[in-house]
Amino acid sequence: MRSVYCGVLTAANIGEEVTLCGWVDRRRDHGGVIFVDLRDRDGIVQVVFDPDAEDNFALADKVRPEYVLQVTGKVRARSESTVNANMATGEVEIYGTGLTILNTADTPPFQLDSFTSVGEDVRLRYRYLDLRRKEMQHNLRFRSKVTNAIRNYLDEHGFLDIETPILTRATPEGARDYLVPSRTHESKFFALPQSPQLFKQLLMVSGFDRYYQIAKCFRDEDLRADRQPEFTQIDIETSFMDEEQIMSVTEGMIRKLFNDVLSIDLGDFPRMPYSEAMEKYGSDKPDMRIPLEMVEIKDLMKDVEFKVFSAPANDPKSRVTAMRVPQGGEIPRKKIDAYTKFVSIYGAKGLAYIKVNDKDDLENGLQSPIVKFLPAEVCKAILERVGAENGDLIFFGADTTKVVTEALGALRCKLGEDLDLYTCEWAPLWVVDFPMFEETDEGGLTALHHPFTAPSCSPEDLQANPATALSRAYDMVLNGTELGGGSVRIHNQDMQQAVFKILGISPEEQREKFGFLLDALKFGAPPHGGLAFGLDRLIMLMTGADSIRDVIAFPKTQSAACLMTDAPGAVDAKQLQELHIRLRAKPQAAKDEAGKEEDK
């Protein structure tokens, strides 16, 4: 139906007869000449209809925005005064000699341009129209380009693209599963995979050596700006590689991707232990563009009379830290009060600070409500330890280790954004040496990553000191965003059972939920490991999109609903009967409580 795309025409095509298909972006009538901006996925070109071509002119007079047209005409140069430097096709136009209206269109509920502000609910309800917008066309074409580059890289490095099941069984991987009732197996359910984790490990046992998949994954969890109930993962697994080799291959992939697609050289990725990331930056995915660090001052506060600092300083489960903000003394008190409210979200009871007006005058040069409670020698030691200069602001955290780390870590990122402290555009990083386990609120242990991650010690040492064991895990971080996480896996049955035991999974539960994996580990499982990248998050970062929903064709809302299709939806009684399911009415008390939660 067409010979060329609208957006690719240039001066090199002048004189050619072309046939185009697309949508009417705009129609203008100037002095008896009709101009139609015709749009397709590659861009826009101007088509001119004049009264000499009577039939075409009359038809062109009827077209309206978003009509679908087929246009035949000759490419000609625009006059010098009408050249549009803002359009890729701005040097040329089409002199229309043929016109067919392929379809009409109702008036869209919003303008499909980059300048009109439209509520996201409206955009998602009419997603098929929203996707016609230039920004969305760019994002999805960019996504296709990225996945193609990733496939090419992995293919060149000997990886095989192998699909794994979507209908599987529930396994404890952290989030809630999406369950699918089985019609043929009464009272039993499939689960949609949270990741292809166990299947890709089994592929290594099967001898495929290098596997990858652009995989759909599903997690029934509360949503945020960077989360979706169904998301896409770049899933990778290898045999006979240690963590350094796996990190080298995957780092090479991301570096080549950024270089090929964005012409950006990320350089080598530095390594940082998890303990350092948490102590200095308050996050296991620190944004290294921000030149702010937490400095431990617990030892300086143990003997001060100010209980706000001395109490946590003498508590082994607490910490006292200081964070210097260069030239932060200009921050007004009203803004400091706002930051105090901000850290309270993370459990902080307050936000102490000192403004350094004159570091050499400890009596009069420090401005703060807390200075009067601190001896001069302590103030001097704090200034020296954080490297304070005149005009700086020092924030303090004093509470449990968890509260201080999370509160000042979040404040660090907020200050970086508010004060535009970024020192570079891109800051990649590997975070390594993660703890094997973390403590639950009930005092037990849970896997920091997942229960199939290999520890860096023997089964005996692991069982003797599980709380201090380190894992062979690694996370790739870029600009404070976790691009991907992975680990060397457990390939020995004894070690896997030892980990399950520490996690409180009984032998019976091990056999019920993971019997197939434990059996596979007995039949010559090779050393193996891998990594998974969040594709949606990666695209969001590379395009600069505000939300992950802007890089997915048909995303869900933050309440996990599709406004366009009205999913999830009710099903009829016959379908439920076939699945052996009966719905019970929610008790009125529960309905009332749910209503209260919605009101919040």
UniProtKB/Swiss-Prot annotation:
<dbReference type="Pfam" id="PF00152">
    <property type="entry name" value="tRNA-synt_2"/>
</dbReference>
<dbReference type="GO" id="GO:0050560">
    <property type="term" value="F:aspartate-tRNA(Asn) ligase activity"/>
</dbReference>
<dbReference type="GO" id="GO:0005524">
    <property type="term" value="F:ATP binding"/>
</dbReference>
<keyword id="KW-0030">Aminoacyl-tRNA synthetase</keyword>
<feature type="binding site">
    <location>
        <begin position="534"/>
        <end position="537"/>
    </location>
    <ligand>
        <name>ATP</name>
    </ligand>
</feature>
<comment type="subunit">
    <text>Homodimer.</text>
</comment>
<protein>
    <recommendedName>
        <fullName>Aspartate--tRNA(Asp/Asn) ligase</fullName>
        <ecNumber>6.1.1.23</ecNumber>
    </recommendedName>
</protein>
<dbReference type="InterPro" id="IPR004364">
    <property type="entry name" value="Aa-tRNA-synt_II"/>
</dbReference>
<dbReference type="InterPro" id="IPR002312">
    <property type="entry name" value="Asp/Asn-tRNA-synth_IIb"/>
</dbReference>
<feature type="binding site">
    <location>
        <begin position="219"/>
        <end position="221"/>
    </location>
    <ligand>
        <name>ATP</name>
    </ligand>
</feature>
<dbReference type="InterPro" id="IPR006195">
    <property type="entry name" value="aa-tRNA-synth_II"/>
</dbReference>
<dbReference type="GO" id="GO:0006422">
    <property type="term" value="P:aspartyl-tRNA aminoacylation"/>
</dbReference>
<dbReference type="InterPro" id="IPR004524">
    <property type="entry name" value="Asp-tRNA-ligase_1"/>
</dbReference>
<feature type="binding site">
    <location>
        <position position="489"/>
    </location>
    <ligand>
        <name>L-aspartate</name>
    </ligand>
</feature>
<dbReference type="InterPro" id="IPR029351">
    <property type="entry name" value="GAD_dom"/>
</dbReference>
<feature type="region of interest" description="Aspartate">
    <location>
        <begin position="197"/>
        <end position="200"/>
    </location>
</feature>
<feature type="binding site">
    <location>
        <position position="228"/>
    </location>
    <ligand>
        <name>ATP</name>
    </ligand>
</feature>
<feature type="site" description="Important for tRNA non-discrimination">
    <location>
        <position position="30"/>
    </location>
</feature>
<dbReference type="InterPro" id="IPR004115">
    <property type="entry name" value="GAD-like_sf"/>
</dbReference>
<feature type="binding site">
    <location>
        <position position="482"/>
    </location>
    <ligand>
        <name>ATP</name>
    </ligand>
</feature>
<dbReference type="Pfam" id="PF01336">
    <property type="entry name" value="tRNA_anti-codon"/>
</dbReference>
<keyword id="KW-0547">Nucleotide-binding</keyword>
<dbReference type="GO" id="GO:0005737">
    <property type="term" value="C:cytoplasm"/>
</dbReference>
<dbReference type="GO" id="GO:0003676">
    <property type="term" value="F:nucleic acid binding"/>
</dbReference>
<dbReference type="InterPro" id="IPR045864">
    <property type="entry name" value="aa-tRNA-synth_II/BPL/LPL"/>
</dbReference>
<dbReference type="Pfam" id="PF02938">
    <property type="entry name" value="GAD"/>
</dbReference>
<dbReference type="InterPro" id="IPR012340">
    <property type="entry name" value="NA-bd_OB-fold"/>
</dbReference>
<dbReference type="InterPro" id="IPR047089">
    <property type="entry name" value="Asp-tRNA-ligase_1_N"/>
</dbReference>
<comment type="function">
    <text>Aspartyl-tRNA synthetase with relaxed tRNA specificity since it is able to aspartylate not only its cognate tRNA(Asp) but also tRNA(Asn). Reaction proceeds in two steps: L-aspartate is first activated by ATP to form Asp-AMP and then transferred to the acceptor end of tRNA(Asp/Asn).</text>
</comment>
<feature type="binding site">
    <location>
        <position position="449"/>
    </location>
    <ligand>
        <name>L-aspartate</name>
    </ligand>
</feature>
<keyword id="KW-0963">Cytoplasm</keyword>
<keyword id="KW-0648">Protein biosynthesis</keyword>
<dbReference type="InterPro" id="IPR047090">
    <property type="entry name" value="AspRS_core"/>
</dbReference>
<keyword id="KW-0067">ATP-binding</keyword>
<dbReference type="InterPro" id="IPR004365">
    <property type="entry name" value="NA-bd_OB_tRNA"/>
</dbReference>
<dbReference type="GO" id="GO:0004815">
    <property type="term" value="F:aspartate-tRNA ligase activity"/>
</dbReference>
<keyword id="KW-0436">Ligase</keyword>
<feature type="binding site">
    <location>
        <position position="219"/>
    </location>
    <ligand>
        <name>L-aspartate</name>
    </ligand>
</feature>
<feature type="binding site">
    <location>
        <position position="173"/>
    </location>
    <ligand>
        <name>L-aspartate</name>
    </ligand>
</feature>
<comment type="similarity">
    <text>Belongs to the class-II aminoacyl-tRNA synthetase family. Type 1 subfamily.</text>
</comment>
